């Protein structure tokens, strides 16, 4: 949306224009972009991980200025999506040990997690020799001075809305403790008078 594109599900497109829906479906089972109308559409029946990747893949085509389909452009769009969803530096600071960690922390498919982790290992070797200008800029952008740490994940607590940083938990520490306390509090107590 930031780039002026509207995002629709395939069902939304079908409700608006059956012909465009058929074109989307024939073009891709996952997602489609229509540059002239500034539209990205995706199949809402895919997994949430696949949807996120597909939308970022289409955004990659847009950001990289791709005007035609070819294998090289597809590789570039995949690389873009992978790095947007699981930046290699963020994989490092999240201390991911394998592709399952990457998939879990960054909410991407196992296949995407495997690709990202393999690429991370190459990045790590390169970064050990020399930190690139891009890496320095990324570090500055995601480093939180007050927290004194690199931030790779920000989300609100599902109960109180407090900001949770760098955690796979959906509840803040206070709400988790309250939840545990309630689970272990007896419904009634007996009195021995």
Where are these regions (language model features)?
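Active-site hotspot residues in diverse enzymes, especially metal/ion-binding acidic/histidine motifs
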Residues: 1-193
């Amino acid at each position: 949306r930031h780039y002026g594109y509207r995002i629709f599900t395939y069902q939304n497109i079908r409700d608006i224009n059956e012909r465009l829906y058929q074109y989307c479906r024939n073009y891709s089972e996952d997602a489609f972009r229509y540059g002239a109308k500034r539209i990205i559409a995706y199949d809402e029946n895919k997994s949430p991980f696949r949807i996120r990747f597909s939308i970022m893949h289409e955004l990659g085509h847009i950001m990289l200025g791709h005007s035609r389909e070819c294998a090289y452009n597809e590789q570039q769009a995949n690389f873009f999506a992978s790095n947007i969803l699981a930046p290699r530096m963020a994989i490092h600071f999240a201390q991911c040990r394998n592709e399952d960690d990457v998939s879990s922390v960054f909410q991407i498919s196992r296949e995407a997690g495997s690709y990202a982790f393999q690429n991370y290992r190459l990045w790590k070797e390169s970064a050990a020799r020399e930190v690139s200008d891009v890496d320095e800029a990324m570090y500055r952008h995601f480093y939180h001075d007050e927290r004194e740490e690199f931030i790779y994940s920000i989300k609100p607590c599902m109960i109180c809305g407090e900001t949770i940083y760098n955690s796979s938990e959906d509840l803040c520490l206070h709400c988790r403790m309250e939840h545990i306390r309630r689970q272990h509090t007896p419904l009634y107590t007996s009195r021995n008078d």
